[in-house]
Amino acid sequence: MDYLEKLQSLMENHPSDFFSLWEEYCFNDVVKGDELVVLLEKIKGSTIAPAFGKIAESVIPLWEQLPEGEEKDKVLSLVFDVQTTNSKNLLEIALQQVKKYEDSANYKEALRIVGLRDGITFSHCLGRFALLMHLSEGNFVFHQGGWGVGEIMGVSFLQQKVLVEFEGVLTAKDISFETAFRMLVPLRKDHFLARRFGDPDAFEAFARKEPVAAIECLLKDLGPKNAKEIRNELVELVIPEEDWSRWWQSAKIKMKKDARILAPASSKDPYVFDPKGFSFVSQLQASLSGSNDANKKITSCYAFVRDLGSELKDESNRQLVIKELKALDLPADSALLIQRAMLLSEFLGEKAPELECENIAKLSEDQLFDIVNNIEILSLQKSFLALIHSCSPVWVPVYTKLFLTTSTSMLREQVFKVLNADKEARENILKKVFAMIEQPLLCPELFVWLFARVVDGEDGLFAESDKKEIERQMLASALELMHKVATTSQKDLGKKLYSFLVGQRFLVVRQIIDQASIEYLKEFVLLSSKCPQFTQGDLGVLRSLAEVVQPALKRGTPEEEENILWTTSDSFTRMKNKLQSLVGKEMVENAKEIEDARALGDLRENSEYKIALERRARLQEEIHVLSEEINRAKILTKDAVFTDSVGVGCKVVLESDQGDKVCYTILGPWDANPDEKILSLKSKLAQEMVGKAVGETVLFQGKKHKIKEISSIWD
């Protein structure tokens, strides 16, 4: 344990031991500025600060040994923050330190404000003096109370106030010097926060052009940050949300070659900036020495040779990597052995007998499959697959097995491309694919991947004449798969299929079921109804799509169609409110009317009582009818409206033989308004139009009208 750790440990728990060790520390031959800064900042916020303030002057000999620079100034400023003696020696040092500001117009006034003019009490004087000298129009400060970065708009040494416009406050704020000493931290004009607040457009342009320099600026001024924290500092404030992923990926690639930014071992660890720079080779050595895991060592070497190929121009660096790789004790015929061989061969120019064709040809199908499956570096995995294809007589079964089992999309793409190019392998794959279409649970991930490729026309497996039928088979299997995986660990595949099918207003479904037979569509509707991923609205749309293709489906279910009461959201809310009023208000009032009428006596001749009873009967009937209608109601949504033929939710333009045009909107009975030319779906004219397309004829008021245009009420 070094001095810093020991002193920090004793600070709170053993103060007396701390001061004894501090005396010893003061005689140290080697003085580290960064260590002193950390120690003094800890003391400043600790319970021993008052006691240490009496001996703070003991830091001065250590301070004098430090080289000139920001670190030395920081140490001295901290000494004056904790000192309580206000000695003559400290006063002279302070006056000498602030002499660099003597040309400032407010120099003498600042001396008075911080206590250096009379020299009686001057605690915190250097930090406060530096802040006062920084308080000029156009400079920036940071508010430690949550107001964020601010730009100085004006200063009055007479009133001892500063006017600051903060990013987190709507109006500029007048702040007294006394408050400023406690809350404000001066920022350089090139500080990350100052640049982000002062000229965000210029800083965004800079960050786009020089992403690594922008991140260096952030880490230098704000300290180490992990990826999430970097995102929080930059997204929207510098880089727009929609551009962030692309910008960050580009920045990460470039940062790998920046010697001044140390990349983290994991996503939770921070990026660290060091102006002196880090040695890439020393980073590699530290990574290798810090682990006994051969897999991690191979991964570290791969990252080094992949990202920092220029470092290998130095022969000593190349030999270092070769030595580290060859020193690994690896089992024969293992994925690790093959990965090492490929690194030595492809990146380091070393011969690797394990990769010779005759040796690969000796490996069995199971051995090759296990090796490929256990190679964790994708590019090496793909390279070894290419070797298997070139050298092994059993490459087809290895590729086929991998195609059926891998969950890596890029690997599946490569394997599929090679298999599809070979006639014999292609026939074998087709047999497997047809079996999978029949039973998608055999290879569910592969089925979902292949379904998307077939629909997009990127499979290359099936003849164009067979494609439509294959798509329909796969759609039916997809619905079956969605039903079966809904409550299993593979439910995400069901969600993926759902998103694929409902995207772009069910475009995939519409393309596949176009011109399908009525038998297929009946099965399609039935399978859809079993999928819990579909909402009731989705199921209504799917049924409507099927009915558009085969109108006979409508005629087959007249009762079901008749039972739906289409309504807009506003009308549905209005009717629900009406029902609540009938039940909760009018029925209660009617009950009181009946009770009052009873009190009049002689119910046989009591007309008030009879009227009240009749009103109750009417109310009960109205409540019954309205309740039944609400139960049948279905809110009309954008996805439920189709304009290839007239239906609910459509606006229809009719043209008479004389050229007169009239536009009708078709909605449910609750929304009907003849004055506004809004027809109920159940009206005679609407029923005459429903199911007809543009160009067809409608008989209206004894005259023929042609349908000129069909649009959605949302268009």
Curated annotation (Swiss-Prot):
Necessary for efficient RNA polymerase transcription elongation past template-encoded arresting sites. The arresting sites in DNA have the property of trapping a certain fraction of elongating RNA polymerases that pass through, resulting in locked ternary complexes. Cleavage of the nascent transcript by cleavage factors such as GreA or GreB allows the resumption of elongation from the new 3'terminus. GreA releases sequences of 2 to 3 nucleotides. Residues 562-715 are annotated as: GREA. Residues 1-502 form the GRAD1 domain. This is Transcription elongation factor GreA. The keyword Transferase does not apply. HAMAP family: GreA_GreB. GO terms for molecular function: DNA binding; RNA polymerase binding. Belongs to the GreA/GreB family. NCBIfam families: PRK06330.1 (NF004969). The keyword Isomerase does not apply. One of its GO terms (biological process) is DNA-templated transcription elongation. It comes from the Bacteria. Pfam families: GreA_GreB, GreA_GreB_N. The lineage of its organism: Bacteria, Pseudomonadati, Chlamydiota, Chlamydiia, Chlamydiales. Residues 603-640 form a coiled coil. InterPro entries: GreA/GreB_C_sf, TF_GreA/GreB_CS, Tscrpt_elong_fac_GreA/B, Tscrpt_elong_fac_GreA/B_C, Tscrpt_elong_fac_GreA/B_fam, Tscrpt_elong_fac_GreA/B_N, Tscrpt_elong_fac_GreA/B_N_sf. It comes from Chlamydia trachomatis serovar D (strain ATCC VR-885 / DSM 19411 / UW-3/Cx). Keywords: Coiled coil, DNA-binding, Transcription, Transcription regulation.
